[in-house]
A protein has these predicted regions:
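Flexible phosphate/Mg2+-sensing switch loops adjacent to catalytic phosphate-binding sites
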Residues: 48-79, 334-344, 381, 472-474
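Extended helical coiled-coil dimerization/tether regions that scaffold
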Residues: 206, 210-351, 511
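Short alpha-helical segments and helix-capping/turn motifs at coil-helix boundaries
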Residues: 72-78, 107-113, 177-194, 283-286, ...
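The start of beta-strands in P-loop NTPase/AAA+ ATPase cores
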Residues: 4, 200, 347-348, 447, ...
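Switch/communication elements of ASCE P-loop NTPase nucleotide-binding domains
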Residues: 1-48, 301-438, 457-458, 468, ...
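Glycine-rich phosphate-binding loops of NTPases
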Residues: 57-87, 91-232, 236-243, 419, ...
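Acidic, divalent-metal-binding catalytic cores of TOPRIM
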Residues: 403-676
Length: 676
């Protein structure tokens, strides 16, 4: 029995979001302010154990607020009928199997099943924050003032909050695979406690009160050890031994107290013997509690393996303390679930942003360890902003939250993985492997730039600074994928709707089956050997590729392919022209006048370029030899790229400039920041 999915309606940015869950670990990813924390919070508010963490009118979604205001501002006499009362709904979709699940698990949900049909394997529990009397709510809202000068939205929410009409209700019903209800039985009403008896949840939030200053006296790790102690089984021999020792200490202390306070107690008895309290005899005893002693008298300390010195808890870094604290919390949860008097069939642990205070290497260690700490019968849901956490997970465990205007959509990456594992195994394998090579940054970026190799990756930050400065205020990611593999990443970019450009090379070759590399020029004897260009721009005459308009280089309005074209060539004084085949010769053509200046003769460390500039001082001569130099097997691309990053006033080829400006414009049109 598992929690298969969660549907959220009307809560903050979650206008209507369905999140499917894995049987084991589910990782929720996305940019900042895409509703990841809200996803955890609404579950905590409806079925968590924190009674002070309730739902309020301020949690209503922007869409519901807008509909309410529009209806109330309507001048129609039927305005009251048009008012849509806001509500918040959390639906827990539980899958069960009558053959495989234990009798105890089936028994826990049996009272709430609304069909005896054995084909039904889904129970939905609807948790709802809604008014008990909609008519009354409508009346107080429509009677409220609607003067534009007032903060009418705040006033309406306050009226709803103070009305006392909104209550949280729980009901369950059976549903079939096609989401139909095949009987007319009413839904079963539940209490929050009855829901928690089916689905037990625990939470570790990002804001843990840990400090690494020497003045920190909170001893929070000691508190974590105390909780772990409380969750250990009553029949654990080690616990009994510890309790016996505490009892022995208690007896010894009581005897000592009796002797120490003997005179004082005798004098008190003497002075009170003639009063109504004279028949009472005072006694001072020790009352020790093991768990309280662990917290109040136990201190976690660290021993340095190299020097054998012992240091207090506060002297260790936040990262190690955070990791230790979280592991202790998980172990305590395990013990609680294992030894709970009322065993629940579904147990879920939520961990919010475990990367807080953990450096990248420790983040990777954490995610590898955490899933192994939980029993296979439990579900674990992690929200994260960390590509290091994500790089350790499989594609099928990922759920990508994306903000579109004022609402969140959830992209189930397992759907993409299942489709491409069948339809395009190469794309699936490429993305799966690249996840561990930091392609995971895609899930946290506002846009992506895919490049051929190290040279492009080194030069792109300077290009952005020069050509598209507004991109610097966004979270862009530059991913090195090579000319061959870019085409396998594009389907994922389109699935998660991430604006992207691919900066690649035209790769001109002879127009025959195994054509050799050739210098580009407008000729029917040439073609492009670049797989990404051929698949996403199209196989066409080389001359047409050189002059293709922008619209035909853009795929599904999301991904633009950028390659060397007509504008990236070099015009000689006689009417002749050389065309660029790679970024390197395109850079030389765009900066031939700069390279010809005396100030750069000693600047370049790339040997072939250095030799060229020492021999030539004419820009035409430099451009004439550019193709042969960058095509030479001894040409050092990375060194040349670094050399170029240090050149003031460097001009980037038009195909790079145009691509970056296009990406800048597309990103600026999208709502990439909002509250969750």
């Amino acid at each position: 029995m598992k929690l298969a999915a969660v549907r959220i309606q009307g809560y903050r940015a979650h206008e209507d979001t369905t999140v499917t869950l894995e049987n084991g670990l589910t990782v929720v990813v996305g940019r900042n302010n895409t509703g990841k924390t809200s996803f955890i919070e609404i579950i905590d508010k409806f079925i968590g154990n924190n009674k002070r963490n309730g739902i309020h009118a301020t949690d209503f979604s922007a869409g519901q607020r807008r509909q309410l205001l529009d209806a109330l501002r309507c001048k129609s006499k039927k305005r009251n009928n048009n008012v849509s009362i806001p509500s918040i709904t959390l639906t827990l979709i539980i899958n069960y199997n009558l053959k495989d699940d234990t009798r105890e698990d089936i028994a826990s949900i049996a009272p709430y099943l609304t069909t005896l049909d054995t084909e039904c394997t889904t129970l939905e529990i609807e948790c709802k924050y809604t008014p008990t009397n909609e008519t009354y709510i409508k009346s107080i809202l429509t009677e409220s003032t609607t003067k534009k000068s007032e903060k009418i939205e705040d006033k309406l929410l306050k009226l709803i909050e103070e009305s006392g009409e909104y209550k949280t209700t729980y009901q369950a019903r059976s549903t079939f695979a096609d989401n139909t209800i095949k009987n007319t039985n009413e839904a079963r009403i539940l209490t929050k406690e009855e829901v928690r008896a089916i689905v037990n949840t625990e939470y570790i939030y990002a804001q843990i009160n840990l400090d690494d200053t020497s003045t920190d006296n909170g001893h929070h790790l000691s508190s974590a050890f105390e909780r772990f102690y409380k969750e250990v089984a009553e029949d654990t021999q080690l616990r009994h031994d510890l309790d016996d020792r505490i009892d022995g200490m208690q007896t010894s202390l009581s005897n000592a107290y009796t002797q120490f306070f003997e005179d004082a107690i005798a004098q008190i008895a003497h002075f009170t013997s003639d009063t109504s309290a004279g028949s009472l005899k005072l006694k001072v005893e020790s009352e020790l509690n093991t768990s309280r002693m662990i917290n109040s008298t136990t201190r976690v300390k660290y021993t340095d393996n190299t020097s054998s010195q012992t240091y207090p808890e506060s002297h260790n870094g936040l990262g190690y303390s955070r990791l230790t604290y979280t592991i202790l919390q998980i172990l305590a949860f395990k013990e609680h679930w294992k030894h709970s008097q009322q065993s629940t069939p579904i147990n879920i642990l939520f961990i919010e942003e475990p990367e807080a205070h953990l450096h990248p290497q420790m983040q990777e260690v954490f995610i590898r360890l955490v899933s192994s700490l939980l029993d296979t019968g439990s579900q674990l849901i992690i929200t994260t902003h960390s590509s290091h956490v994500l790089s350790e997970r499989h594609l099928k465990s990922l759920r990508y939250f994306k903000r579109i205007n004022d609402r969140v959509v959830c992209k189930d990456i397992s759907e993409w993985a299942d489709k491409y594992k069948t339809d395009n195994i190469k794309a699936y394998t490429t993305v799966s492997n690249y996840i561990q090579l930091r392609i995971s940054d895609l899930f946290f970026a506002d846009c992506a730039i895919l490049v051929e190799g190290a040279a492009e990756r080194l030069l792109l930050p300077k290009a952005i600074q020069t050509c598209a400065t507004n991109l610097r205020s966004t979270h862009y990611t530059i991913i090195e994928v090579g000319g061959i593999y870019a085409k396998h990443i594009i389907p994922l970019l389109e699935f998660i709707e991430l604006p992207s450009i691919v900066i690649t090379d035209i790769d001109s070759v002879e127009n025959k089956q195994h054509g050799q590399k050739a210098e580009p020029k407008p000729s029917p004897k040439l073609k492009s050997a670049n797989p990404t260009i051929n698949e996403y721009v199209g196989k066409m005459a080389f001359t047409e590729l050189l002059t293709l308009d922008t619209a035909r280089k853009v795929h599904n309005n999301l991904v633009r392919i950028c390659y060397q074209a007509e504008a990236d060539g070099y015009e000689f004084t006689p009417p002749s022209k050389k065309y660029a085949r790679t970024l390197e010769d395109a850079l030389i053509y765009a900066n031939a006048h700069l390279f010809a200046s005396s100030t750069l003769k000693e600047h370049f460390q790339e040997p072939l370029i250095k030799k060229l500039l020492q021999e030539e001082s004419d820009k035409d001569s430099i451009a004439e030899k550019a193709y042969n130099i960058v095509s030479d097997n001894h040409f050092q691309k990375t060194t040349f790229a670094i050399d170029c990053t240090l050149v003031d006033g460097l001009i980037f080829p038009p195909y790079v400039q145009e691509g970056l400006l296009w990406l800048e414009q597309v990103v600026s049109k999208k709502d990439i920041t909002a509250n969750s």
